[in-house]
Regions:
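NAD(P)+-binding Rossmann beta1-loop-alpha1 motif at the extreme N-terminus of oxidoreductases
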Residues: 1-50, 59-62, 89
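Conserved Rossmann-fold dehydrogenase catalytic segment
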Residues: 136-143, 170-186
Length: 186
């Protein structure tokens, strides 16, 4: 399966590194072309996750269409204030019934709107497989393979199972839930 990570900060980079040991087509979108070039050359995200090696298996692009088109799973890992905008931007290339994972942390605004609500609104009619991924994790720990645990939550059990299957490993534990509100507010 093609997996697109939308966001190349510390958390997005760490989450992609975690997937590198599995048999998937991995691509990470970085909005800054110069930074994407630097990451391709050095195989490191020196700005946000120094010291963590980015395996060659992970393609890095600054072209959103290239990242999203054909992806069965799209993981949005941007600052919370741009999650909904990013969901709207990727919509033209989003595959029907793709799993869209929100790995960003926080709320959409000061009124308490959840990030998954904005994603759901933007991709309505294309997919209902929206998953919130959250846990007591730090990018610098995940990026170097330290043990961690997270929760994947969705109203669609199949979507949660896909995310659990993608990430579950001896050092990265993924627990399923249907309480997306609780996971996002927790």
């Amino acid at each position: 399966m093609k997996i697109a990570m939308i966001g190349a900060g510390g958390w997005g980079t760490a989450m992609m590194i975690e997937l590198a040991g599995r048999n998937n087509d991995l691509i990470m979108y970085c909005r800054n072309p110069a930074r994407a070039d630097e990451m391709r050359k050095t195989r490191e995200n020196g700005e946000y996750l120094p010291g963590a090696h980015i395996p060659e298996k992970i393609r890095i692009t600054s072209d959103l269409e290239e990242a999203v088109e054909g992806a069965g799973c799209v993981i949005i890992c941007t600052p919370s204030h741009v999650v909904e905008e990013m969901a709207a931007r990727l919509k033209p290339w989003l595959m029907k019934d793709a799993v869209v994972v929100c790995a960003s942390k926080g709320l959409a605004d000061n009124e308490g709107h959840r990030l998954s609500e904005g994603i759901t609104k933007e991709v309505a009619g294309i997919t209902d497989k929206i998953v919130a991924l959250s846990g007591p994790n730090h990018a610098e720990e995940v990026g170097i393979g330290l043990p961690c645990a997270t929760v994947a939550a969705s109203a669609v059990p199949e979507a949660v199972q896909i995310v659990q299957d993608l990430y579950m490993s001896p050092v990265f534990r993924v627990y399923r839930s249907d309480d997306i509100r609780g996971v996002e507010y927790g």
